[in-house]
Regions:
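Active-site loop immediately N-terminal to the catalytic Tyr-X3-Lys motif
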Residues: 28-34, 56, 96, 114
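A glycine/serine/threonine-rich, flexible loop-to-helix segment
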Residues: 56, 67-93, 133-147
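Active-site helix of classical SDR
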Residues: 3, 39, 47
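Alpha-helical segment proximal to the catalytic Tyr-Lys
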Residues: 8, 52-56, 117
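Hydrophobic alpha-helix immediately C-terminal to the catalytic Tyr-X-X-X-Lys motif of short-chain
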Residues: 42, 46-50, 54, 64, ...
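Active-site loop-to-helix junction immediately N-terminal to the catalytic Tyr of the SDR YXXXK motif
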Residues: 29-37, 49, 77, 137
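Residue(s) in the substrate-gating loop at a strand-loop-helix junction
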Residues: 23
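C-terminal helical subdomain
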Residues: 63, 83-119, 124-128
């Protein structure tokens, strides 16, 4: 898809940047989850491979791996209770809360900008310290949000 839909436009523009959305789930085992983490791990490899293939065309390819980020899913699971989401997230994120979409967007904007002109093939964890904590707790987190 990249080769057909994206590459020609960026090539015609003389280069550019692609940012893929992966997830912290791509790097850790999580109870009761298989397909999502596997698909996100595959996208990490796609990011690295595209970075190698597109570098000569002045196209940078990176990815962001968000931690828990306030979204429709979390809103629905908690009936809109952001404070509850943050309480549950505190056990899994060093910064003690879920992220905001705008915080992830700031990293994406950086990666798409000229300020990231020497960055390619990298994955940025925008995860409030989740990945620094090591293994996820053995107690599943998603059911706690729905309680």
């Amino acid at each position: 898809m990249y080769k057909r839909q994206v590459h020609p436009h960026l090539l015609a523009a003389g280069g550019g940047a692609i940012v893929n959305f992966t997830s912290i789930s791509s790097r850790v085992a999580q109870t009761g989850r298989w397909l999502y983490p596997v698909s996100k791990a595959a996208l990490l490899q796609v990011t690295r491979s595209l970075a190698m293939d597109y570098a000569a065309d002045r196209i940078r390819v990176n990815s962001v791996s968000p931690g828990w980020t306030w979204s429709r899913v979390m809103d629905e699971l908690t009936q809109g209770d952001r404070a509850k989401t943050d309480r549950v997230a505190a056990d899994y994120h060093l910064l003690g809360r879920a992220g905001d979409p705008a915080e992830v967007a700031e990293v994406v904007a950086f990666l798409l900008s000229d300020h990231a002109s020497f960055v390619t093939g990298a994955d940025y964890a925008v995860d409030g310290g989740y990945s620094a904590m090591g293994p996820e707790q053995a107690r599943p987190a998603i059911p706690r949000l729905a309680q």
